[in-house]
Structures are given as C-alpha cells and as structure tokens.
Amino acid sequence: MIITIGGLPGTGTTTIAKLISEKYNLNHVCAGFIFRDMAKEMGMGLQEFSKYAEENPNIDHEIDRKQVELAKEGNIVLEGRLATWMLKKNSVEPTISIWLRAPSMVRCERISERECEDINTALNKMINRENSEKKRYKELYDINIDDLSIYDIIINSSAWNIEGVFSIIDRAIANKSK
C-alpha cells in the first residue's frame, strides 16, 4: 500500500500521516522532516534554507529521489506537498492520494501554536515559505501546486477535528482496499 498525503503548512498532514501509519502499520516518510534535517545540517533556519533551495535545485531533487525510492518499496505513508506529483512523474501510482486544506488564518493559528510564535510572525513566515515553495515547484518541475486534480480526496481539515478527518480518510482507505 502506498498512501500520499499533502497539504500546505498547518493543515494537519503530519498528524494524519502518523495516524494512518499507526493504524495500517506503514512506514511514515515526511518530505518536510527531510527538508528540516537538511536545513539543520547546514546551520540554517527554515526560511533561510528555503531561499537557499531556490538557488540550489539539488536540494529538492535529493528529497524527491528519496521519496520515490522509498515509495517503490511499498507499505508507506508518504507525506509532502509534491509526494503525489513525484510518484506519478516516476510512474508509481499511489493506492490513494490525499490533499488537506484549511483557510489561511486557521493554518496560521495552528502554526503559531506549534512553533510558539506570535500570529504576525507565523503569518509572515508562512506566506514567505509558501511563495518560495510555489516558485521552486513551478521552476523546477513546471508544477502548479494549486492544481489539485491529481488527488483522490481533498478534505478541509478545519471542518472537523483530527478524529473526524482521520475517520473520513480511514473509511476511504478501507473502501479502496476492497
């Protein structure tokens, strides 16, 4: 089973991916964690590393390569904004692909709480990060991250609590597996 889950920062992808991973006994691989680890290794913050990645496409290519390689082994929940795109570009079809969305201010509040930052700081960082990623994805892969047509399921994660979002996805996986 290969499950991809994507969404902009603050939509709950990591929380949901962990729940899916635990329930179905799948490996959980998060592109964002790989990106953060690379930033830390280079002694940079996330914003600074995002700008660095704009000038150094090898960063994104390495993350993508790792994701595709791991997905080919199966039994995985692959979390990342480009996870579904990268698999499909490499002729690997996910069992199910999910995109989580939520209004900007809801996402900002979640990020602010998670990062222990004030709302304005979190909003500024969120906007800068999203703009940087959108630009990189377009330039590197000609991917419009706003095109959600490749996903099986799109869920507004602000409309339900975590248990509700997970329940919807769990039922979809169970029905897809039959």
UniProtKB/Swiss-Prot annotation:
Can you cite a GO biological process for this protein? pyrimidine nucleotide metabolic process
Q: Which reaction does it catalyse?
A: CMP + ATP = CDP + ADP; dCMP + ATP = dCDP + ADP
Q: Name one GO molecular function term.
A: dCMP kinase activity
Domain of life, per UniProt, equals Archaea
EC id: 2.7.4.25
Q: Name one Pfam family in it.
A: Cytidylate_kin2
Q: Does the record's keyword annotation contain Transit peptide?
A: no
Location comes to: Cytoplasm
Q: Keywords in UniProt for this one?
A: ATP-binding, Cytoplasm, Kinase, Nucleotide-binding, Transferase
List of residues binding ATP:
G7, L8, P9, G10, T11, G12, T13, T14, T15
> Looking at the UniProt record for this protein, which Gene Ontology cellular component terms does it annotate, in alphabetical order?
cytoplasm
Class of enzymatic activity (EC top level): transferase
- Give the record's family classification: Belongs to the cytidylate kinase family. Type 2 subfamily.
NCBIfam families given for it? cyt_kin_arch
Q: Which HAMAP family match?
A: Cytidyl_kinase_type2
Query: Which protein are we looking at?
Result: Cytidylate kinase
